[in-house]
Curated annotation (Swiss-Prot):
PANTHER family: 1-(5-PHOSPHORIBOSYL)-5-[(5-PHOSPHORIBOSYLAMINO)METHYLIDENEAMINO] IMIDAZOLE-4-CARBOXAMIDE ISOMERASE (PTHR43090:SF2). Keywords: Amino-acid biosynthesis, Cytoplasm, Histidine biosynthesis, Isomerase. Belongs to the HisA/HisF family. This is 1-(5-phosphoribosyl)-5-[(5-phosphoribosylamino)methylideneamino] imidazole-4-carboxamide isomerase. It comes from the Bacteria. CDD domains: HisA. It catalyses: 1-(5-phospho-beta-D-ribosyl)-5-[(5-phospho-beta-D-ribosylamino)methylideneamino]imidazole-4-carboxamide = 5-[(5-phospho-1-deoxy-D-ribulos-1-ylimino)methylamino]-1-(5-phospho-beta-D-ribosyl)imidazole-4-carboxamide. InterPro entries: Aldolase_TIM, His_biosynth, HisA_bact_arch, Isoase_HisA-like, Isoase_HisA-like_bact, RibuloseP-bd_barrel. Its EC number is 5.3.1.16. Pathway: Amino-acid biosynthesis; L-histidine biosynthesis; L-histidine from 5-phospho-alpha-D-ribose 1-diphosphate: step 4/9. Its main location: cytoplasm.
């Protein structure tokens, strides 16, 4: 099975940034021009990107919606978007401007009925559940809060109501370039019967991508490793082909 590799664009203050372990005070601007960054990916032959509205995650609204819609309109890239999704109207609006998949994060923990309603209205192909965990416990509200629910139990509960795709982020590894938490992915994949998993957090090299392919993951999100020059766009395409 081939693994899709999604370069990430995290948006804050209209710029493409990277955070360290999700800490907003430790942000690095990687490209002040978000559209230009998306074009770089497009020109390199990337087909899908992972876009996070960081203000949205903090404020619970689609703060960068217009910019994200513009990325879609100008590049035609497939886009999966997350950050601040709190209503069916927001999801509908994103899908209406051509966004391919919408990630529901905090609401999956706080309001499973919302996920059910989203699945019913938009279908499991458009809805992704983002599970962000700190030491195995699910983090919410832009990672500022940690719940007492572990990542496996949330994934199983979501799979039961019809979720078929997860993005799993190990917050402790995100933006650290220390390697992915392979054990967590193994446990998650072994627990799920129908759903697929996209990995995020800690990926530091093309070797990591090869190792993750062996696990049977549906995809992997590459952020800091690309922006810091450790993984090239050529290596990303090669890993997808291989």
């Amino acid at each position: 099975m081939s693994m899709k590799i999604l370069p990430a664009i995290d948006i804050k203050d209209g710029q493409a940034v990277r955070l360290f372990k999700g800490d907003f005070s430790q942000k690095t601007v990687v490209n002040p021009d978000v559209l230009e960054q998306a074009r770089v990916f497009k020109e390199a032959g990337v087909t899908m990107i992972h876009v996070v509205d960081l203000e949205g995650a903090l404020e619970g609204r689609a703060a960068n919606r217009d910019l994200i819609a513009q990325i879609k309109a100008e590049t035609g890239l497939a886009i999966q978007v997350g950050g601040g999704i709190r209503s069916l109207e927001q999801i509908e609006d994103y899908l209406a401007v051509g966004i391919d998949r919408v990630i529901i994060g905090s609401m999956a923990v706080k309001n499973p009925e919302f996920v059910e309603a989203a699945l019913e209205r938009f279908g499991s192909g458009k809805i992704v559940i983002g599970i962000d965990a700190k030491e195995g416990l699910v983090a919410t509200e832009g990672w500022l809060e940690t719940s007492n629910q572990d990542y496996i139990s949330l994934a199983l509960a979501m799979e039961k109501i019809g979720v078929r795709l997860f993005v799993y982020t190990d917050v402790d590894r995100d933006g650290t370039l220390t390697g992915p938490n392979i054990q967590h992915y193994q446990k998650l994949l072994a627990s799920l019967k129908h759903a697929q998993v996209i990995a995020s957090g800690g990926i530091q090299s093309a070797d990591d991508l090869e190792e993750m392919k062996k696990l049977g993951l549906a995809g992997a999100i590459v952020g800091k490793a690309y922006y810091s020059g450790r993984i090239s766009l050529e290596q990303i395409k090669e890993a997808e082909r291989g």
